[in-house]
Curated annotation (Swiss-Prot):
Swiss-Prot/TrEMBL GO biological process terms: DNA recombination; DNA repair; SOS response
Principal location class: cytoplasm
NCBIfam families per the UniProt record, alphabetical: tigrfam_recA
Family in the record: Belongs to the RecA family.
Designated name of the protein: Protein RecA
Keyword vocabulary terms for this entry: ATP-binding, Cytoplasm, DNA damage, DNA recombination, DNA repair, DNA-binding, Nucleotide-binding, SOS response
Bilayer-spanning residue ranges: none
GO cellular component, one term: cytosol
Function description: Can catalyze the hydrolysis of ATP in the presence of single-stranded DNA, the ATP-dependent uptake of single-stranded DNA by duplex DNA, and the ATP-dependent hybridization of homologous single-stranded DNAs. It interacts with LexA causing its activation and leading to its autocatalytic cleavage.
Stored HAMAP family: RecA
InterPro entries per record: AAA+_ATPase, DNA_recomb/repair_RecA, DNA_recomb/repair_RecA_CS, P-loop_NTPase, RecA-like_C, RecA-like_N, RecA_ATP-bd, RecA_C_sf
Length: 343
């Protein structure tokens, strides 16, 4: 078959597909209107850099998992606040029935515009999510959490009844149904997940996430968040030191890490990240306990410098801008072969 005949055959096939399934159902990749991946900031400067595109990608599934009280919900509330700043409409499926509106407001969430649902069953939660995504009016939807998506059969059954893999089947079926809608509507879909321990594991990590393996495959980005220490003011604990690892990333190189402070009552400390990344990139000078910017001392001790940056937002914004410009120099990639995922 000559090249001309091939082109005619392909054109006829494409015309037939478009006639059957509508215009735009098949095309050459270069003809797609959005080639570049759009992103929404996570509210963490370090995590935005670690993700490689400046935040979480639009039209993709994101999984955020970690131990209890590690900052999972805090991170998702920052995501909502950032999406709302860009004029986005967000929804929160609160399957755990534990969302605190006062805390969400402190983190910058416009609670008057946030759509919330507190479903009774896993099927109901995922059907609500599906309807909202298909509406094309939602920019971001949070499902908190996968562990709380209890199948109807389990709720209606007796305590102690065996429900073998019913939640995993529910998640697998839902994700098959949701994936196309999420991509078509450009909706960011974030699943919060919990960690469980596998019994009888002799080698490797015994940790696993709930809901089976489907979410691991369908997620474009998987973020592991851990509390690694406490922040104290004298004897009082005022926050948590947090480490985040991007364990899977389909839009940029994975296995990058970021550290930030989560302050109780106010969320992720932007100023703390600016100090740490500024020092790492030689934008802020550190000599002993003193910090300087452009040869001017801005404070002694990290907490005092954080306060200085809060009081001088123009300097904070200036340093942040330089950090983002130099962010390509950060190469904190941990290629741990035992944690690599091939999917």
């Amino acid at each position: 078959m000559s090249n001309t005949d091939k082109e005619r055959a392909i054109a006829a096939a494409l015309a037939q597909i478009e006639k059957s399934y509508g215009k735009g159902s098949v095309m050459k990749l270069g003809q797609r209107p959005h080639v570049d991946i759009e992103a929404v900031s996570t509210g963490s400067l370090g995590l935005d850099i670690a993700l490689g595109i400046g935040g979480v990608p639009k039209g993709r599934i994101i999984e955020i998992f970690g131990p209890e009280s590690s900052g999972k919900t805090t991170l998702t509330l920052h995501l909502i606040a950032e999406a709302q700043k860009k004029g986005g409409t967000c929804a929160f499926i609160d399957a755990e029935h534990a969302l605190d509106p006062a805390y969400a407001k402190k983190l910058g969430v416009n609670i008057a515009e946030l759509i919330i649902s507190q479903p009774d069953t896993g099927e109901q939660a995922l059907e609500i999510a599906d309807t909202l995504i298909r509406s094309s009016g939602i920019d971001m939807i949070i499902i908190d959490s996968v562990a709380a998506l209890v199948p109807k059969s389990e709720i209606e059954g007796e305590m102690g009844d065996a429900q073998m893999a019913s939640q995993a089947r529910l998640m697998s079926q839902a994700l098959r149904k949701l994936t196309a809608s999420i991509n078509r509507t450009n909706c960011i879909t974030v699943f919060i997940n919990q960690i469980r321990m596998k019994i009888g594991v002799m080698f490797g990590s015994p940790e696993t996430t709930t809901g089976g393996n489907a979410l691991k495959f369908y997620a474009s980005v998987r973020i592991d968040i851990r509390r690694i220490g406490s922040i104290k003011d004298k004897e009082e604990v005022i926050g948590s030191q947090t480490k985040v690892k991007v364990v899977k990333n389909k839009v940029s190189p994975p296995f990058k890490t970021a550290d930030f402070d989560i302050m109780y009552g106010s969320g992720i400390s932007k100023e703390g990240e600016i100090i740490d990344l500024g020092v790492k990139l030689d934008i802020v000078e550190k000599s002993g306990s003193w910090f300087s910017y452009k040869n001017v001392r801005i404070g002694q001790g990290r907490e005092n410098v954080k306060q200085y940056l809060k009081e001088h937002p123009q300097i904070s914004n200036e340093i942040e801008k330089i950090i983002r410009e130099k962010s390509s120099k950060i190469t904190n990639i941990n290629l741990d072969q035992t944690e690599e995922e091939n999917d």
